[in-house]
Amino acid sequence: MAHENVWFSHPRNYGKGSRQCRVCASHSGLIRKYGLNICRQCFREKANDIGFHKYR
């Protein structure tokens, strides 16, 4: 069994490795609330387009 066959052969059905940002495919800093599945960096860029507004 070569290294190419072993790489990423472990099933990722749960945990951080199973979820990714729908914009940039990153696994870190994911916001899952309300089914967003967007990382926090992309959320700051797209928040106004999605409909989130900042109130003071």
Swiss-Prot record:
Signal peptide: none annotated. Keywords: Metal-binding, Ribonucleoprotein, Ribosomal protein, Zinc. Binds 1 zinc ion per subunit. One of its GO terms (molecular function) is structural constituent of ribosome. Its cofactor is Zn(2+). The keyword ATP-binding does not apply. The keyword Ribosomal protein applies. InterPro entries: Ribosomal_uS14, Ribosomal_uS14_CS, RIbosomal_uS14_euk_arc, Ribosomal_uS14_sf. GO terms for biological process: cytoplasmic translation. GO terms for cellular component: cytosolic small ribosomal subunit. Zn(2+) binds at residues 21, 24, 39, 42. PROSITE patterns: RIBOSOMAL_S14. Belongs to the universal ribosomal protein uS14 family. This is Small ribosomal subunit protein uS14. It comes from Eremothecium gossypii (strain ATCC 10895 / CBS 109.51 / FGSC 9923 / NRRL Y-1056) (Yeast).
